[in-house]
Swiss-Prot record:
Top-level taxonomy: Archaea, Thermoproteota, Thermoprotei, Thermoproteales, Thermoproteaceae
Protein name (Swiss-Prot/TrEMBL): A-type ATP synthase subunit B
PANTHER family the UniProt entry points to: V-TYPE PROTON ATPASE SUBUNIT B
Family annotation (SUPFAM superfamilies): P-loop containing nucleoside triphosphate hydrolases (SSF52540)
Underlying gene: atpB
Species annotation: Pyrobaculum calidifontis (strain DSM 21063 / JCM 11548 / VA1)
Alphabetically ordered keywords of this record: ATP synthesis, Cell membrane, Hydrogen ion transport, Ion transport, Membrane, Transport
Top-level lineage group: Archaea
InterPro entries, A to Z: ATP-synt_VA_C, ATPase_F1/V1/A1_a/bsu_N, ATPase_F1/V1/A1_a/bsu_nucl-bd, P-loop_NTPase, V-ATPase_su_B/beta
Known partners and oligomeric status: Has multiple subunits with at least A(3), B(3), C, D, E, F, H, I and proteolipid K(x).
Function: Component of the A-type ATP synthase that produces ATP from ADP in the presence of a proton gradient across the membrane. The B chain is a regulatory subunit.
Chief place of localization: membrane
Any Gene Ontology CC annotation: plasma membrane
Amino acid sequence: MLTPVVSYSTVREVKGPLLVIERTRGVSYGEIGEVVGPDGEPRKVQVIEVATDYAVAQVLGGTLGLPSKGSTVRFYGKTLKIPVSEQLIGRILDGKGQPRDHMPLPPPEDFRDVNGEPLNPYSREYPEEPIETGISAIDGLYTLVRGQKLPIFSGTGLPHNMMAAQVVRQSTVRGSGEEFAVVFVGIGIKTEEALFFMDEFRKTGALRRAVAVINLASDPVAERILAPRVGLTIAEYLAWQLGYHVLVVMTDMTNYCEGLRELSSGKGELPGRRGYPGYMYTDLATIYERAGKAHGKKGSVTQFPILTMPNDDITHPIPDLTGYITEGQLVLSRAMWGKGIYPPFDVIMSLSRLAKDAIGEGKTREDHKDVANTLIAAYSKALELRNLATLVGERNLGWRERRYLRFADAFEQKFIKQGYYERRSFEETLDIGWDVLSILPEDELTNARPQITQKFYRRHIFESVAV
């Protein structure tokens, strides 16, 4: 039990989830303590602003029923730390790191600061090994790399929750002796969504290798800010101390940013773009930059954050700033979803900046880079020809152009589209890629090396497709 070192009965104001404490001395940013109201119930607090004669603290348990008069705040001179253990795998926690599954916490192996320890840039190792998600659009075109941070840009009503559950369930790393774990962080999600994830993880057995940190929309907003940091702290312990390759799936980062805006407004700060605080870029970086690999460490931390773009606007501050920090983005398309295609990836708008270094012989398969480059180039050309066909009619196109239209249909229906419970290996994904590419004439596949085309091209498929 921590011994309080400073105690104040000078709470000036309770403002939303915040306390304003007057005449403070020696209180530090990030310091933890507790506030006790007239009812005698202690609630954990964390300092989020320090001035010469006052401090602002967020109440992690909410301020409902907490008056300013008669409340006492005690500070402990320490930052917020949570107990971590390998036995947390298989457990469900809340945004503060406390059990949500009605079981006691396992004996702690260590206590870790939720703000983490920044990786020295010199100690970082360049990510070059893939994670197999079992989803062709990701594995085949925009491969997720161990130590990468690759977000999904989604929209309201799109199936990003299904994708998050599928990635948690299916993802793995290849290689004997490689330990793999998933940390799932639900940020400000509805009870219905939380029940979906928990039922899915339990039913499929995914929870046996996962830690779930669930922050509900009804939980205090201060806990929403804490939840991703709690999840990442657990992930870092598993990676750096125990050698796990950890995939951190976080949804929905838009809820996190809305919570950040709410706290900023409560502190009376000047708003930035669209009301978000001017330091949102820096704040997001403190989360995203905790991904990576380190020299001399066996494990890695990979981030797969999901955010919903307000009004499908990719220039909105949340996706805009996220794109600056992360190493690519996977964009979901409302048009593809409207055509009944799951997962509804927008292939042209998506990008993985590190994929090129994690694919190929010895990592996935020798033809992987050729397949990815050729599929994207051919699909881009096919989309242009689709627009042309709506103007002049498909019959007025040449036979090669009509082949591209057949290719685009097959690419969407066979390669991109797959079942929610369908898992494809790298080899299966690449084979399907060659199946759809073989609809095109062999001399059109100029983005693939000739020796690769000669080895994998399926001429019988080309001959069987009528145009």
